[in-house]
C-alpha cells in the first residue's frame, strides 16, 4: 500500500487549484483506497506541498481514455495520451485515482 504519492512539479499548481482531480498510475502505484489521506510531494525534489484524500480507484485502459479523463487531468486528450506514454511507455492497463486536496498548510499558494 502506498503511504505517499509524488507528482511532477509541473502539475503542482493544477493540483492545488483543483484543476487536476485524477491521476493515472500503473498497477504498482495503484495500491490506495477510498478515504485514504496521502501526503503529496514533488517527484523531482521530494518536497511536500499538500495532502490528498483518495475518493476512488478505478481500472482504466489506455485505449479507453476519454475527453473526460483529460479534463480531470486538466489536459487535452492528445496531451494526456502523450504524457502517459512518456511515463508508462506501451502500458495499456492503468488505474485512475480520483482525489481531492485536503491540506495545504504551510504552502504559499500564489
UniProtKB/Swiss-Prot annotation:
Stretches assigned to the ASCH domain: 6-93
Catalytic activity: N(4)-acetylcytidine + H2O = cytidine + acetate + H(+); N(4)-acetyl-2'-deoxycytidine + H2O = 2'-deoxycytidine + acetate + H(+); N(4)-acetylcytosine + H2O = cytosine + acetate + H(+)
Entry EC number(s): 3.5.1.135
GO cellular component: cytosol
SMART domains documented for this protein: ASCH
Domain of life (superkingdom): Bacteria
Active site: 20 (proton acceptor), 23 (nucleophile), 73 (proton donor)
Top EC class, one word: hydrolase
TM helices/strands, residue ranges: none
GO molecular function: hydrolase activity, acting on carbon-nitrogen (but not peptide) bonds, in linear amidines; N4-acetylcytidine amidohydrolase activity
A Pfam family reported for this protein in Swiss-Prot or TrEMBL: ASCH
Gene3D superfamilies per UniProt: Hypothetical protein (2.30.130.30)
CDD domains: ASCH_yqfb_like
Keywords noted in UniProt: Hydrolase
Family designation: Belongs to the N(4)-acetylcytidine amidohydrolase family.
Function: Catalyzes the hydrolysis of N(4)-acetylcytidine (ac4C).
Database matches in HAMAP family: ac4C_amidohydr
The protein's name in its UniProt record: N(4)-acetylcytidine amidohydrolase
Protein's organism: Shewanella sp. (strain ANA-3)
